């Protein structure tokens, strides 16, 4: 078995909060938001790993820690066997070229005063991807790659639709010829029909360019159609990881079961008959003891309140739950594209 391209081990991130006047006078320590709590994760070369979970589960923080837009407090991040948390200078720039991120809001990541041509030329120049004479041809290639007309390169971001701006963000990421693409809520702000077009474009680009993709989303339909494997996050921890179709067919963790049961489905015969998670997401400032899901879990018992479960093998992958038994892994069918007319 080949080594993973990206390996995350024990990744922890806390965001310190301001103290109240009373806490300051009492010299109490600063409270902190526990965004990531010892995350372990691996991504194989050429695969798409979907990251799902409720808002506040730590998905986007994990993505930003991987590309070092946010520095983790503890843990290791290895890319192609190298600890990327130690990289600096030219080594850091080389990593930035190999791993690119596409953001949820393209308007916030594109300079409104620069045309698409200037944006793409800047990336090509900074990373020395082409000689000056070859930049126009490369820009034309990139526009064609994301299915935008060549003449659109001389327009500004505000002249495009949301889906087109997201394609420009993808083109900018691809301009430096990365190996790994991290898509953070790539299409969550787009209409459903446009979502299908962008997701199918991503599938096509992966097959054409051999990309490894980390796909962060809360929309389970998108994750199912795009991902080879899925990791489920809850309050800063990975609670279950499995091959995509195996996870959707037989979720092992109670949180995964509740997450799938909450997803809308027009076919009544396919609706999950699983108890829903109780209450609201607990505060990440004061995490529950033991298993962090136990206050909402319909199956919780005393051990869940006392002891945090470790990931264990299941019939479909791994999951962190005291209820689980050991079973043989299940066979997983292939992915399919989303129909262009919708999801």
Please report, for each region that a protein language model flagged, where it lies by residue.
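Short catalytic/signature loops enriched in Gly
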Residues: 3-4, 17-27, 32, 243-343
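Conserved ABC transporter NBD signature motif
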Residues: 75-83, 95
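Conserved ABC ATPase "signature" region
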Residues: 82-83, 134-151, 260-261
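Conserved ABC ATPase signature
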Residues: 156-160, 164
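A short, proline-enriched helix->beta-strand linker immediately N-terminal to the Walker B motif
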Residues: 175-179
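P-loop NTP-binding/switch modules centered on Walker-like glycine-rich loops
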Residues: 182, 186-272
